[in-house]
Every structure is written in structure tokens, then in C-alpha cells.
Amino acid sequence: MITHAPIRYQSKFYFYENDYIIGASIKMYGEYTQVEVDLLKNYINSTSVVYDIGGNIGYHTVAFASMAKEVHSVEPNDRNYLLLEKNTQHLNNVKLYHCACSNVVGEAFISDYDTTQPGNYGECMMSETGQPCKTVRIDDMDLPPPDLIKIDVEGHELKVFQGAYNIISKHRPVIFYESMHGTGFDVIYDTLTTLGYTIYYFPAKNYNPNNFNGVEQNVFGGGGVINCIALPASHGKIAGLPEMCDRTDNYNIALGRFIKAKEKQ
């Protein structure tokens, strides 16, 4: 069932009632991983162009649209795209693309979910079966130069990077992507550091104590995701986040190194 609730960016935001992560967070807290938006807003202003690759039902897209000049949001799953359209239909600075970003132009499949059953609807990923979808390369999409690219594609990150290499190497945007080891994570590190990027880990808990609705109850426990934010040389450093120092690094190693360095100060 589709329902709606107010969020900090608009009075009605549509979501699926049975989604026990994104939907539950919107319903209870009026937001979803707002800590990610709070980090990324430091790199968005009224002239910024943002790509939201893996727009899902649009929370980040709507948030970005409140700050940026343009937001280009890509979502392949039909059910997600339906709500992405509903949630952004009043926003003149948002353009939507019903496809999947990859390293080839063609066709593929994206996993689906049953909205009559409880589930984590944010886990749609490229699959051998499921909904058919078109695949595109970001380099071929004729988009304006990006200032920020957010990528959340459940393990397909490397192929998105491969299909966007020309855009990234030419324009050096800030890039925010999910940390999924074993899916080309080391190759992404090599690619970005060769281009002069510095990569930091950014853990995002599902529960935000400063949530929009002011709810103190934490229904998610310690659940969340580990992300990476990659900054080009022109953006300097981030003092408060653990840096990824080589292609085999992981969050726990980087965090331990970060804590030890702080203790020595």
C-alpha cells in the first residue's frame, strides 16, 4: 500500500507501508539517512548540478533539489520510479531517468519486490531475472557537468564508475557511494586516487537522534550502511572522517588508524 507522511522538505512524501527500512523511517522519523544529506549539503549550493544515481523513491533527490540548481535522478525499478515521480512532480529543477546506469548501453534486469509483503525495498539490484530495464552510460547521457554524484546501486558501483569515467575525469565532482567490498571496490579506489581524489569512510546509521519528528525511540538499533565520500584535490581534506589509504583498506582498519592518530594529538 502507498501512503504518505511529511518530511523536512515537503508536506507529503509517498512511500510503501510495508517497507520496513525506508518506509518505516519516513513514517516514524520524517526522514531517511538524513545524516548523509547533512554531510553532502556542504558541497551543494544554488548553482550546483547533482546526479542521484539510484534515486529509489526520492528522499535524497528531494533533499538535493531544495539546495541545488539541478538534480538528475536515475532509477530503474518500476515501483520505486512510480513514487520517485510522485514525490518530485512539483519540482521544476528535477529531471528523472527510468533506466539503470552501467558501463554498457543495452538491456538488463533489476530485482523486484512484492509490496503486499514486508521487506527492505531499498535493496533492488541488478539481477539475472526480475524487471527488464534499459542500461545507459552516464558519459552518453548528455548531462550538464556535475558538482556532486551520489551513487547507491547495491553492488553495481564499479560499472557505474566505468560508464562515467570521462565525466568524472574531466569535471572532478565530489562523489558519494556505498562501500561494498568484493564488488570492484579496490578498482574504484585505484581509479579515483589516480585522478587525485582522497576517499573517506562515512558511516550512516538509520536512526538519527536529531530526526525531523523529534522521536527518541530507536527502532533500528545500530543498523545502517558504510559509505565513501571521494573529494577531488580542489576540495581539500575532511578532518573528522577516517581516510581510505590503500585498495585493501576497510572501514574497521581505517577507523582504528583514525582513532590512534587522534590519541597521539
Protein language model features and the residues they cover:
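Phosphate/nucleotide-binding beta-alpha loop and adjacent structural elements of enzyme active sites
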Residues: 1-265
